[in-house]
């Protein structure tokens, strides 16, 4: 059976997610693989070049010694650079770390791949010792210590001062996505824990309790509108007059955040689609906007919460992707929702999108019923 939670649509309205545009996927390991390929090719070319200039044994010793020297100096240079960071953190020791020296050092000298870095540093040091033991006279000249200290003390500080250590926008974006540090990640988690996790498991019961809509709502899911513009109308009928407000489901009353029997209530919307024979077919949906998107819209329009148009477009894509990941992993919510990305600019298209998704969901429901019957 097809995954009911997938973003879907049919026909003309399914042009790049209903006009929303492409939804990006998480970044993979292509950059790491490319770096490894460059490393291998460069190493091989250097080895060939050294072998042509010098005797094979001497050339290999030179290449190994220089690589170990530069690697060790680079690691030590990074430690020296981070020591400079400590000088700033000491000014905030009481406010940020409650006066804890261990906290200052931990946040400054923590490495994600500390084990690998330690192995590389020790291996480089042992390699230097071995090569010096084997050919001390060849590698004991004054040029090598100067090169070591330049690469250890001068170059790291210079690169830090001129900004070469600054992460690129791509790296910053990748880091934020991996560690859930984007604005969109926080909004998606808040939307889930503060609302969807509470109402989606109860949605079927609320529909069943409604004498008016229990037989009219044939797809028992919450349809969540996700406009790329992030602007949410106070009434969906303003975005598409064919989507009419029909009524409400019985409320779910939940004790939440000090409020006893807090009320959560879904709106039901009706769409009337004319058929070729002149009759009209009615569809009923439990439908609403994703309310956190309005926060993104207002942030992009507020001077003290600067969020440019391109940044907002990026965040809304991340919001949809993160929300889908969260809901797909939740047994309580899986199969009880449909994400409906739309452009937000084109009016009078929401009804077409919803009817197309209704048809796809109905087919999935029939397939599921047939499978259960066969079993």
From Swiss-Prot:
Membrane topology: Multi-pass membrane protein
Entry's localization field: Membrane
Transmembrane segments: 30-50, 60-80, 114-134, 144-164
UniProt entry tagged with the keyword Translocase: no
Domain of life: Eukaryota
Pfam family, one: STING_TM
Protein keywords: Immunity, Innate immunity, Membrane, Transmembrane, Transmembrane helix
GO term, biological process aspect, one: positive regulation of type I interferon production
Annotated positions binding 2',3'-cGAMP: 195, 256, 262
Alphabetized InterPro entries for the sequence: STING (IPR029158), STING_C_sf (IPR038623), STING_LBD (IPR055432), STING_TM (IPR055434)
Protein name, entry field: Stimulator of interferon genes protein 2
Cited function: Facilitator of innate immune signaling that acts as a sensor of second messenger signals produced by cyclic GMP-AMP synthase-like receptors (cGLRs) and promotes the production of type I interferon. Innate immune response is triggered in response to nucleotides from viruses and bacteria delivered to the cytoplasm. Acts by binding cyclic dinucleotides: recognizes and binds 2'-3' linked cGAMP (2'-3'-cGAMP), a second messengers produced by cGLRs in response to nucleotides in the cytosol, such as double-stranded RNA (dsRNA).
Family statement drawn from the similarity comment of this UniProt entry: Belongs to the STING family.
Any one GO molecular function term: cyclic-di-GMP binding
GO cellular component, one term: endoplasmic reticulum membrane
